[in-house]
Structures are given as C-alpha cells and as structure tokens.
C-alpha cells in the first residue's frame, strides 16, 4: 500500500536480525521511536551494527523477528518506492556526476530553481565554497568530483539530500570529512530545517551527535547505552571514554602551530 500522507512516527522494534546465509545475529533487541522533529544519534565501535540498523530502515532487507513501522504500518506492507521517496540518505562516500555543481545538487529535483539550490547549499555550509569556484554553480566538477575536497563533496551531497525535502533524513557518517566548526554550523542549520522532520545521524565523531534528542550506543549488535549527550558523558562507558579521547585529540591537533611559533621565537 502507499505510504500515508503527512509526517508520522518511525518505530523500530528489531528482536533479532541475521543477514541472509548467516546464523549469527547482526542485531538483537534494537528498539527506538522517533516522532517527527526528533533527531536520533547512532554511534558505537566499527562492526557494532550501526549500518545494519540504517539499511533495515531503508528496507534493504526484511526482518523476520520484529519490524520497522511508519505511521504504525510495517514497512513490508508499504510500497517500496513510495517508502524510499520519503527518505533522503547521505553516505560517507558521496557520488558526484561529471556535471555542474548546480546540477549535482539538483539531481533528485531537476526542476529546482537556482534560489532553492542556493538555499540548501547555505544550509549545508557549502554556498561560500561554491562561489569561490571558477564558474560558481556552473563549474563542472570533473569525473567523480575530483576538483573538490572530500568535505566539499560531502556537503554538496547533504545539500542534494535537503533539496529532496524528504521527511526522514539519514546521514551515514556523512560529516566525517568536514572540519569541526563547519560540522557544528551544519548541525545547527539542520536543527532549524528539521523542525517537523526526522533526522538520523550515524557518526564516528561524537561531536556530530550533541544536538540529538536521543543517542543510542551500539555494541555487538545491541544497544549498550542510550540517552542525551549530557547524560551519556557523565556515565562510565564507551561513549564517555570515546568522547573524552576525541576532545583530547581535537585539542592536540589544534596545538602544534603554537609550539612551532614558540620554537621560532
């Protein structure tokens, strides 16, 4: 059946999920609900099940034990293309075509106006970068976007996803090549853009999750910790350890210039 009109709650209740031809569960007891306007953060070590959760929401596989529901209807009962048209997904390695920057952003909505294209580019903090290119939005990006940095490519694909105006935005480690300050700006913009929309962010860098209404920490295919950023940084566990480590790493990577200046003084 077609997906009902209007914004609805996304409810994930996975009792167990095994990939085809495997017996070891990739996920066990993963449950969460997301109302329109909420932002969910997903984190955890590599291989913990983050990508599996995201692929089940996109219905790349069907679940036999449990279900994912939208508007309280299991995804298996919804038309697949109708469901996927409600999602905008940005992966870690975005795909750009050998075309202009503007056409790359308008990929999912070729009829979009220049004004709409620039609006989403601003939300994705990439508008200023584009204006610095030789022909601005009409600059050809070359094969697979070779002219652009990794962070610029990620931001262009975030702009492309925002232009789709989908109800559910999924960022799968899609800010990994973006610097901390820009990441902060994009997340702030997403909060405002996302009023009434559902945003799911999976990330290795935990600073990307501080705005989330709930964060789930995946380990070995299940939810090891959950809560808001402020409460998780105060609980002993993977999240607090990793957050402290990343804060330290960020502070150290900002420091070397000072030492060089002192050495040259």
Show where each model-derived region lies:
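ABC-type nucleotide-binding domain
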Residues: 3-265
